[in-house]
A protein has these predicted regions:
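Residue at a beta-strand N-cap/secondary-structure junction
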Residues: 37, 47-48
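N-terminal leader segment of winged-helix/HTH proteins
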Residues: 1-30, 96, 146, 150-153
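Charged, amphipathic alpha-helical coiled-coil/dimerization segments
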Residues: 20, 48, 52, 56, ...
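Key DNA-contact positions within bacterial/archaeal DNA-binding proteins
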Residues: 35, 63
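C-terminal regulatory/oligomerization modules of transcriptional regulators
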Residues: 1, 122-153
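Pre-recognition alpha-helix immediately N-terminal to the DNA-recognition helix
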Residues: 11, 18, 22, 38-41, ...
Length: 153
């Protein structure tokens, strides 16, 4: 019999894939692509980032991000502002119109989490989240923070 953690990487990857797929199904009515709502979600936590930093955080190419931002700006959800001291940089900010959409994204995320955690007691959910945060911190060389616990818990 195989050790339970032998296929951990595959299990985590497959579970994350299924979670993304279910979220996409639940969020379809919002009219945003996964890439668009990911940009909005990251900007909500990191208002005022420049495009290069955002691309790095999302692990996408800058040119790909530019196309996503162009669509979000055309939809009135994101604005690019000049950096106060570096004219080459544009700082990214959410517009007021983005906030109600973010609320709906959070509602979809909560519903998706409830579907994923169905049948798992709250204490076990918390334990799972804590173990994943610790595992991620071990691999990234960072300590977990209270902010991360709130964001993922």
């Amino acid at each position: 019999m195989e050790a339970p953690d032998r296929n951990l990487g595959f299990l985590l990857h497959d579970t994350a894939r299924m979670l993304r797929k279910r979220f996409d199904q639940n969020a379809r009515h919002l009219g945003l692509t996964r890439a668009q709502w990911q940009v909005l979600a990251v900007l909500a936590r990191n208002e005022g980032l420049h495009q290069g930093a955002l691309a790095e955080m999302l692990e996408i190419e800058p040119i790909t991000l530019v196309r996503i931002l162009d669509r979000l700006q055309a939809s009135g959800l994101v604005e690019r502002r000049l950096h106060p001291t570096d004219r080459r940089l544009r700082l990214l900010h959410l517009t007021e119109a983005a906030h109600p959409i973010l609320e709906r994204i959070h509602e979809v995320a909560a519903r998706t989490r409830e579907e994923a955690f169905a049948g798992i007691p709250p204490a076990a959910r918390e334990q799972l989240v804590q173990m994943l945060l610790t595992t991620r911190a071990n691999l990234s060389g960072r300590n977990t923070t209270d902010d991360e616990q709130v964001r993922y818990g």
